[in-house]
């Protein structure tokens, strides 16, 4: 996605070999037009996958997931990173390790928003080691539903996540694939 590549190069900051800061358009301030375009790309790639719902993990995946769901005319479900009292314990949960924050959290899904006939598209902002996407897939499959695909805004291709998910049979589609990060340098996969 050329417009995303351009924004990453113009506004993104490689803070280290593993950390890319894109808070000016994706995960602090959000550019709605760019999110809409992302939704179009995800819709076009996954439109023949017979998807019934779009899932994401709070919070930075919400904007691209909403735009994708809107364009596919489907509901969007947010997987919670902490348990909520209003969920009343009728949930699926799995432990996920956050690469960015270096901590574990309980990914939570209310049982009333999934059934065994669902074919789910998971949308997330970043893919590094694949723990978040794999955790989402575990919840979906625990409910008896299927993972139709995994859409990623920015994939860190130099980390193991994308290959690990593909090796497990998931259809992973990334809008931007980063080959290398170093202080001040961002290189895309050719």
Curated annotation (Swiss-Prot):
Q: What is this protein called?
A: Xanthine phosphoribosyltransferase
Q: Which organism is it from?
A: Clostridium beijerinckii (strain ATCC 51743 / NCIMB 8052)
GO cellular component terms, alphabetically, are: cytoplasm
Q: Does the keyword Glycosyltransferase apply?
A: yes
Entry keyword set: Cytoplasm, Glycosyltransferase, Purine salvage, Transferase
| Assembly and oligomerization | Homodimer.
Q: Which molecular-function annotation in GO is an example for this chain?
A: xanthine phosphoribosyltransferase activity
Q: List residues binding 5-phospho-alpha-D-ribose 1-diphosphate.
A: 128-132
| Signal peptide location | none
Question: What gene codes for this chain?
Answer: xpt
